[in-house]
Amino acid sequence: MANSSVYADVIVVGAGPVGLFVACELALHDVSVIVLERDADSDNVWKKGLLGGRGMYKPALEAFYRRGLLADLLYDEKRVTYLEKTSGFQYAGHFGGRLLNANAVDFSRFKYHLPGPTFLPAKTTIADIECELSKRATECGVRIVRGVEISRVEDEGDEVTVWADNQSFKSNWLVACDGGKSTIRKAAGFQFTGTDSELTCYIAVCDVDKPELLGKGMKPTDAGMYIVSGPRHLYVMDFDTTFDRSQTVTKEHLERVLQRVSGTSVKIEALELVSTFTDRCKQTTQYRKGRILLAGDSAHIHSPLGAQGLTTGIADAFNLGWKLASTVKGYASADLLDTYQRERQPEGAWTLDWSRSQVVIMRPDPAGKAISRLVTEYMATDDGTTFFVNKIWGISRRYDLVGAQAHPLVGCSVPDFQFEDGSYLGSKLHEGKFMTVDFSGSKLLEEATDLVQPWVGYLSCSVKDRLGMNALLLRPDGVVAWVAEDEVKVDSWKAALSQWIVLPGEA
């Protein structure tokens, strides 16, 4: 017999980076949260060091930065805020193993991409992210329950019940962040569609007899690609999907694959760790079904080519957290939660297409090689490099905000304006509120903002370059919802705000 139910406003399933970020966002807004995690221990070799290494691009960096977590996560209080170009090569990313030179990027094309702590990508590990987010979640009162296996979930219309081991948990909402094989997604009947794999990929910690034959870095070949990322760390991507991934990868099998893909006679002398993955690309057709929502790999899976997975998942969490909190607290506009799917599903679909297109240029057939030559030629130009780096880094990502003001900055992440004292706007957004940013010195917006406290903050400041703007309204995730370039009109500001929350007297 099950024990009496444990209740929270929201249940989050999965204590990885996405689930923990959602939990922290909810708790920031005084929403009670329980996180249920299958693994009893967060310590895992695949989350640490080179094996756990992940790239983070602008959307994810901004999420951590705007909640005061970036410096601790990167162990870097004085992060480089701009790219100093050199005469040689500076790595900016890759597309299907074809490298991009940051020195060829024309950053002048990105008016709103200002120097600051999120200007450049960064590297971290899953272990470090989980450590920092777990600390923040605990400080905010989130309860994390580890070592529980979910057996059933039921959306009962006005609440959700989750059964895990000999315990039931009830909440008003459930957010599934439990990975690509999501138990919740399957149990709740979400459709998950897309394309099957063309590649079988191996990641290994091993010793080889002649490492000089392999070299270092990314190596596209006529049979796929391999990557030597460290003295003993190896990735091999093979256009052969006949291997049964439920079987153990032996040293002999991996050696045969490595020799075929690399075109060398290198031998594996010792195999310490090995795992496999594929390039399957699938996405749920709905991000919300009743009171159950999906985020991160629960909503979309793809190969790790281009290192977009972590950024896409954290961006899901950042977009969803404040919207769900507003809904729980009762001040959300009627369709606020619908905007989560409206904004994030296209981003997930783009990530899948970005992954698929890289596989295409890696194909060993004549068509794949022809496309590869064409893409590589374009990437070698300044225009091509600028295009690819913009896409990979997420510099000019923009949400199409229905009914919003027609301005090129509306729907974009707010520029990281630098104040006269040297600080940046991103460091002023830690409370996760809507924010009126006023460069005009007018009292009108301050008085209007006072009427909608505590949901909206007000910041009057002098910045080094206001980019022709007098005032802005920011969502809690830092997305621009309204801009005043000339006269500041309070009615226009109020109309923009009312698209997201119910203003006092309008309920």
Swiss-Prot record:
Q: What does induction of this protein depend on?
A: Expression correlates with the formation of the sclerotia and thus the pigment production.
A single Gene Ontology MF term assigned here is: FAD binding
State the needed cofactors, names only.
FAD
Please tell me which top-level EC class this enzyme sits in: oxidoreductase
Which keywords appear in this protein's UniProt record, sorted alphabetically? Answer: FAD, Flavoprotein, Monooxygenase, NADP, Oxidoreductase
| InterPro entries found in the cross-reference section | FAD-bd, FAD/NAD-bd_sf, RIFMO-like
**Which pathway or pathways does this protein act in?**
Pigment biosynthesis
According to its UniProt record, the EC number is 1.1.1.-
Relate the protein's function as given in its record.
Monoogygenase; part of the ergochrome gene cluster responsible for the typical purple-black color of the ergot sclerotia. The ergochrome gene cluster produces several ergot pigments including the yellow ergochrome secalonic acid and its derivatives, as well as the red anthraquinones endocrocin and clavorubin. The pathway begins with the synthesis of atrochrysone thioester by the polyketide synthase (PKS) CPUR_05437. The atrochrysone carboxyl ACP thioesterase CPUR_05436 then breaks the thioester bond and releases the atrochrysone carboxylic acid from CPUR_05437.
PANTHER family according to UniProt? BINDING MONOOXYGENASE, PUTATIVE (JCVI)-RELATED, TRK SYSTEM POTASSIUM UPTAKE PROTEIN
Tell me the protein family, please. Belongs to the PheA/TfdB FAD monooxygenase family.
* Entry protein name: Monoogygenase CPUR_05431
Recite the lineage of the species: Eukaryota, Fungi, Dikarya, Ascomycota, Pezizomycotina
